[in-house]
């Protein structure tokens, strides 16, 4: 199985680094290419022990899976460049936000299998939750291979393409939403009189420890919360204060706004 990455930006870098580190395939079977920054490309390739090239014909002749990791606005020119060299064995995996499978197929002028994936920045530490949708001609064995690749940098959740908007909101943008919540926690903690550095370090460790509790426990998050909430205690007092601000509606509004924007961006790209 040979992989070609078009684009070596932040997310593509996290993905191919995760795949290399997992050893799910030999690093010599991975090829990188980008639009113009050969210095950065060569540095990535040498550091990871993978190949790099600007020969589109040779790349597509070799590739089983072609990762499309360019900026969405650069894709049309990329498609124009590579479509003469597409072979029957090429299967495409898009990490470009907002571009539907139908649009990608139209620009490539090819009936090859196409998957869209929506990872998040936790791919950098091997813990992305990645939404994935497949075109109807993606075979079961190929799907298994793609799942194996995605598991190299996290976990996969397969959904119909229309539901990628929801996945984008919940898990794609999710790290930023949680970071914002943690920021507010730090700010509130400093207002209680502690040094900011103390609060930041405490909350960082609190987040890590709580994540491990969720990971290692078979209990629901609701039950984990109940287990540490004593009637009439300090935790109950704080939760009572939180409940007065209708957090459920706050988070629902947050996610709906992200979904709506994802739909809007997708519609713009199709025009």
Curated annotation (Swiss-Prot):
Pfam families: F420_oxidored, P5CR_dimer. It is found in: Cytoplasm. GO terms for molecular function: pyrroline-5-carboxylate reductase activity. Keywords: Amino-acid biosynthesis, Cytoplasm, NADP, Oxidoreductase, Proline biosynthesis. The keyword Cell membrane does not apply. Signal peptide: none annotated. Pathway: Amino-acid biosynthesis; L-proline biosynthesis; L-proline from L-glutamate 5-semialdehyde: step 1/1. One of its GO terms (biological process) is L-proline biosynthetic process. One of its GO terms (cellular component) is cytoplasm. Its EC number is 1.5.1.2. Belongs to the pyrroline-5-carboxylate reductase family. This is Pyrroline-5-carboxylate reductase.
